[in-house]
Amino acid sequence: MKEFFSIGEVSKLFNVKISALRYYDEIGLLKPEYKDEQTNYRYYSTQQFERLDTIKYLRALGLPINKLLDFYNSQNTNTLLHLLKSQQVEIDRKKKELERIERKISRRITHIEDAVNMPLHQISKIKLPAMRVAYLQHEYVLGHDIEHSLAELRTHLNVNEDIFIGKIGLSISAANVKAKQFDKYSSIFMILEDENEKTSSEIIFPSREYLQIRFKGSHPEAEPYYKKLLAYMKEHHYEVAGDSIEITLIDYGITNNLDNYVTEILLPIK
């Protein structure tokens, strides 16, 4: 049986990069059996194979190099047990985080497919469940920079950065809707998801009936669709029952093509 193996041979046998084996030697994690003083070549024996197997196994479990060094420096079974239990907790945390991300992605896919496939310019009567929202009463006039309002929402409500990837909307007060002043928004809000933490100024949009319409474009193109909704309400003897909800479902966060923007107006009715 062969007594010594070159670093290249060990690299091939264990599918470990030569640079990694050199690094393990430098930090004292895996020393070769001996090093040729003239050539500086490293040679390994089968005694190093078992440790290398263990290193590969623990690295596959996600244990960092510094933790492996702690284990081998202590030469204590309890140390390894503690490391594995700690790693188990970390893996469970990461798994829950990945599940949360998966739910967000699934919802986003559903929202985009719904925005792409639902007919435009048609009025529908729908009932929506209650919605948690981060809400800021803030006047916004068409033509002003909405990004400043979004930044203020983030700062004022101490909302985490990641939850801005979702449904951000504007509202026109019921009084302004009735007065047909469609260029003055009274508030900006963000629909929160179930796993989002409570914010400092969270409110609930109650479950209620709405008239819904979707159209190509964004907030500057909304006025004729408000007029269309009001005409429909008059024809069917409905009344405005609250502030509007106006959300751009497909915007610059998804596409650079303005022609692909889709916006939804929800008008509470009674």
UniProtKB/Swiss-Prot annotation:
<keyword id="KW-0238">DNA-binding</keyword>
<dbReference type="InterPro" id="IPR009061">
    <property type="entry name" value="DNA-bd_dom_put_sf"/>
</dbReference>
<keyword id="KW-0805">Transcription regulation</keyword>
<dbReference type="Pfam" id="PF06445">
    <property type="entry name" value="GyrI-like"/>
</dbReference>
<dbReference type="GO" id="GO:0003677">
    <property type="term" value="F:DNA binding"/>
</dbReference>
<keyword id="KW-0678">Repressor</keyword>
<dbReference type="InterPro" id="IPR011256">
    <property type="entry name" value="Reg_factor_effector_dom_sf"/>
</dbReference>
<dbReference type="Pfam" id="PF13411">
    <property type="entry name" value="MerR_1"/>
</dbReference>
<dbReference type="InterPro" id="IPR047057">
    <property type="entry name" value="MerR_fam"/>
</dbReference>
<keyword id="KW-0804">Transcription</keyword>
<dbReference type="GO" id="GO:0006355">
    <property type="term" value="P:regulation of DNA-templated transcription"/>
</dbReference>
<dbReference type="GO" id="GO:0003700">
    <property type="term" value="F:DNA-binding transcription factor activity"/>
</dbReference>
<dbReference type="InterPro" id="IPR010499">
    <property type="entry name" value="AraC_E-bd"/>
</dbReference>
<dbReference type="InterPro" id="IPR000551">
    <property type="entry name" value="MerR-type_HTH_dom"/>
</dbReference>
<dbReference type="InterPro" id="IPR029442">
    <property type="entry name" value="GyrI-like"/>
</dbReference>
<protein>
    <recommendedName>
        <fullName>Uncharacterized HTH-type transcriptional regulator YdfL</fullName>
    </recommendedName>
</protein>
<feature type="DNA-binding region" description="H-T-H motif">
    <location>
        <begin position="7"/>
        <end position="26"/>
    </location>
</feature>
<feature type="domain" description="HTH merR-type">
    <location>
        <begin position="4"/>
        <end position="74"/>
    </location>
</feature>
